[in-house]
Amino acid sequence: LLNNDTKILDKDSLGDMLGYCMRPEVGIVGSKLIYGDGTIQHAGVILGLGGIAGHAFIGLDAKEYGYMSRAYLSCDYTAVTAACLMVPKAVFDEVGGLCEEYAVAFNDVDLCMKVRSKGYLVVYDAFSQWYHYESKSRGYEDTPEKQLRFKGEIETFQSKWQKELDEGDPYYNRNFPMTTEAYVLASE
């Protein structure tokens, strides 16, 4: 899956993703996405961050390592964004593909959750790097209609994955708060 508002940064990015996808235990691979200003837009998704799911390291300089080098190293996550995502066709078919109940938001997180529920890994590939001109494809949630749709998608996700939301993201330290940016300790 690839948004029309992305641009490849490294010619080896697709080959790198394919390498992970060829491992039988891997179900999905996502890329590092970088804003035009050189900061990170996506380096993995944390389940429950900000309520449903949030991007790790958003706004961090793309050359920075981040907490325990997780922004700079390929590693497993609960989810990755579909703005640039590779999934073997057999895995995609096995889980029933994208859920049509999500017109815009959370379809990628839902797909990753379904893939993980089948025992596959979701991998963030830090070496597959793309520019992402976010919201050029989907726009912003800036009208009452879009906000109502977004609220409905939140409710759909919660009804389907509440148990997993309650249990917390297995790849995220429970000592970090879920209401602020990822990997930052809250002040008391």
Located regions from the model:
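Conserved donor NDP-sugar-binding/catalytic core segment of glycosyltransferases
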Residues: 6-50
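Non-transmembrane alpha-helical segments in soluble domains
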Residues: 18, 44, 112-113, 154-158
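C-terminal, non-catalytic tails of nucleotide-sugar-dependent glycosyltransferases
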Residues: 27, 37, 49-76, 122, ...
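Short acidic (Asp/Glu) and glycine-rich catalytic loops that position anionic groups and cofactors
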Residues: 131-137
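Short glycine/serine/threonine-enriched helix-capping/active-site loop
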Residues: 29-32, 125-126, 133
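A short, conserved alpha-helix in the catalytic core of glycosyltransferases
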Residues: 14-17, 71-96, 101-131
